[in-house]
Amino acid sequence: KGVVFTVLALLVHAALADAPSFDDVKSRWVSTEGILLDRHGAPIHELRVIEQGRRLEWTQLSDISPAALATIVRAEDKRFYRHDGVDWLAMSDAALDTLLFSHPRGASTISMQVASHLNAALRPTRQKRTASQKWDQISAARELEKSWSKKQILETYLNLSTFRGELQGLGAASRALFGKDPSGLDQPESLLLAVLLRGPNAKSAGVARRACQLAADMKAEVACVQLQRLALSALPAAPNIAPRVALAPHVARALLSPNRPRVKTTLDAELQAYATQLLQQQLAALGGSHVADAAALVLDNRSGEVLAYVGNAGSSTSAIYVDGVRAPRQAGSTLKPFLYELAIERRLITAASLIDDSPVNLITPSGLYVPQNYDRDFKGLVSARTALSSSLNVPAVRTLMLVGAEAFVERLQVLGFDEVIHDGDFYGFSLA
């Protein structure tokens, strides 16, 4: 018999020898959320990049409210700080309940549950563990307590446990269900989270009922009706984590991925927010004209760095999928600066040169072309500087006639406008 027990002990020890350290577990933790940073390192957009599960950054015990810690420990393992991994008294009570009253209930400690999280072989199949699994779980929990501190065990438990649906970890559950970080959890919220650990997908009425019982056991001054209301409002069918910052959805979708969950950009968060606000205000002013989309790209002229990238400031549900910065469309006034630059470079005009902004009729192969300004008004003689800053169309057409369409096309191609593939005659006055 002694030989048999020795062999069993050696087998158990060999199985547990590969148990990871706390630092290993923490280092392997991967959030499902990507984060886009601006040029100063400030978060500018959060985006889910992994579809399996829902996890946030690892939550430390110091970042969890005292109410949440005390409530969860009381609900899950009230003698957690006094046992060596196994609560033999709780196991005896559970065995008696099963034997005498046929009311099976669990007696797994937090340490035992962490051991199961770390070793798939210890997890139950079809809601039940075999006797050998239970024994291995007990042995694993006791071994875990020899190398891990209580704080490390509790911290790991609160990060690896599933609370609701796909929400793994207290950080994800707190944000999704209550819209706050774990440091701000109050007593009623902590009661709901504590009972969710044993029934993550229970209906709100059942969760509220068990939370009410837990409050009574703890002598917590929380009314049952308050817990019922909180459960109804906080436990939707499909809980979701709202991003804390969402200023650059199009850039985030282009740059963030499971392999690149954290990317620093040249964007400036303040300028990005300001550009978005300006576009939204302009869209609101143009609401009567049925204008629903607007985009903006702001570059640093000296370095070429992108400082703001608003792909679409529209409010429609499809706006985040339509990137107006990249979408092919008419050039509008975006080519005018290059046109005037070429004219000045060739000494055809200066910034102070006067250009006639008056009606003009131009003959083209497709018929008569009569350029108009945006406001349908003409300003008369204006400087090239004013014509460009006011985005006047007629002076731009007159400048194009000075430069020549073919020369301007060649300049655009040199500058990297790869979409300009035809000769000057093909584009004609539309280049201005």
List each model region and its residues.
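N-terminal type II signal-anchor transmembrane helix
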Residues: 1-39, 79, 235
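Short beta-strands and strand-coil junctions in structured, solvent-facing domains, enriched
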Residues: 78-82, 101, 200-202, 285
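A short alpha-helix/helix-coil micro-patch that ends at or immediately precedes a cysteine
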Residues: 67-76, 213-221
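Conserved catalytic neighborhood of penicillin-recognizing serine enzymes
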Residues: 97-124, 239-241, 246, 349-408, ...
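Short pre-catalytic segments that frame enzyme active sites
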Residues: 42-57, 168, 172, 253-259, ...
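Extracytoplasmic
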Residues: 29-34, 39-44, 54-56, 64-70, ...
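Acidic helix-start/capping segments at beta-turn-to-alpha-helix junctions
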Residues: 64-67, 83-101, 135, 225-242, ...
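Non-catalytic, structured segments within soluble enzyme domains
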Residues: 14, 103, 107-273, 410-413, ...
